[in-house]
């Protein structure tokens, strides 16, 4: 079992903005199963030694993470209609991932299992199938409809309205021809990670993992404005998780 904070790098907020990076953080959990080639299950003994068996494992897992998303940065802080609409625009995405990674341990898996050392660092690469369910609302309307019209409080005309979606987000390939899409979708993710195991006992380890998931879609967060310099990559996450691993006989 693994769990930890997820930093979602999306189209909400501003690239390389500290407030964005620290603000759009969710939480993820996962259930993990390992294929350990160093052992044979039928005899509960070591398998025939090969370099692959002693240095590689396959990790299969199911992950689920949720992140609430806000627009941070200088534009959202502007005291005008655009800034107001950005601050009022709230997002949320729920993501389910299923996939596998190949883990490489530079040190011997057998020696670590036998207690020769406490730490076993590793690197991994893999792929996940991803199902995502985003949402988007505005606090400027009682019904929260992000596709509706809102009053402009920065004019003297009480009937002056504009779209809840700001310019730059209001044209795209999403719902109603905008850069917002709250429909359920699916995609793939390429994953990389670095981490280490810490031996707690003969049959248990503590695992610390730093993970990057790069999605092959830019709609995972439900927001995909027209291509421009600030929208040059797809959505991705950085996930720091801690897990408990128990060895099954």
Predicted regions and their residues:
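Residue-level signature of outer-membrane beta-barrel architecture
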Residues: 33-35, 104-106, 196-198, 246
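Residues that define the transmembrane beta-barrel architecture of outer-membrane proteins
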Residues: 21-27, 54, 94-98, 119, ...
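Extracellular/periplasm-exposed beta-strand and loop segments of Gram-negative cell-envelope proteins
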Residues: 12-20, 67-96, 132-187, 219-235
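Transmembrane beta-strands of outer-membrane beta-barrel pores
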Residues: 3-9, 62-68, 106-108, 127-133, ...
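Short glycine/proline- and aromatic-enriched beta-strand/turn motifs that initiate or cap beta-hairpins
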Residues: 1-40, 245-247
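Transmembrane beta-strands of outer-membrane beta-barrel proteins
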Residues: 1, 56-60, 98, 119-127, ...
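Short loop/turn motifs that connect adjacent beta-strands in outer-membrane beta-barrel proteins
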Residues: 36-55, 92, 108-120, 200-204, ...
């Amino acid at each position: 079992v693994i769990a930890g904070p997820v930093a979602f790098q999306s189209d909400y907020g501003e690239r390389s903005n500290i407030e964005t990076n620290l603000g759009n953080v969710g939480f993820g959990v996962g259930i993990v199963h390992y294929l350990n080639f160093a052992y044979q299950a039928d005899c509960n003994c070591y398998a025939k030694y090969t370099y692959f068996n002693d240095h590689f494992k396959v990790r299969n897992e199911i992950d689920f993470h949720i992140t609430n998303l806000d627009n941070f940065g200088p534009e959202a802080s502007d005291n005008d209609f655009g800034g107001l609409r950005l601050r009022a625009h709230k997002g949320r995405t729920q993501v389910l991932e299923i996939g596998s990674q190949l883990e490489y341990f530079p040190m011997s898996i057998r020696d670590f299992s036998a207690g020769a050392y406490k730490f076993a660092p590793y690197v991994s690469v893999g792929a996940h199938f991803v199902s995502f369910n985003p949402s988007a609302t505005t606090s400027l309307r009682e019904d929260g409809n992000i596709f509706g019209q809102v009053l402009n409080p920065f004019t003297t005309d009480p009937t002056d309205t504009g779209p809840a979606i700001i310019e730059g987000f209001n044209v795209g390939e999403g719902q109603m021809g905008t850069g917002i899409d709250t429909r359920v979708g699916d995609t793939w993710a390429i994953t990389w990670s670095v981490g280490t195991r810490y031996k707690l006992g003969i049959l248990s380890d503590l695992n610390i993992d730093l993970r990057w998931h790069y999605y092959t879609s830019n709609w995972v967060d439900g927001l995909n404005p027209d291509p421009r310099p600030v929208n040059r990559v797809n959505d991705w996450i950085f996930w720091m998780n801690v897990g408990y691993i128990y060895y099954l006989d």
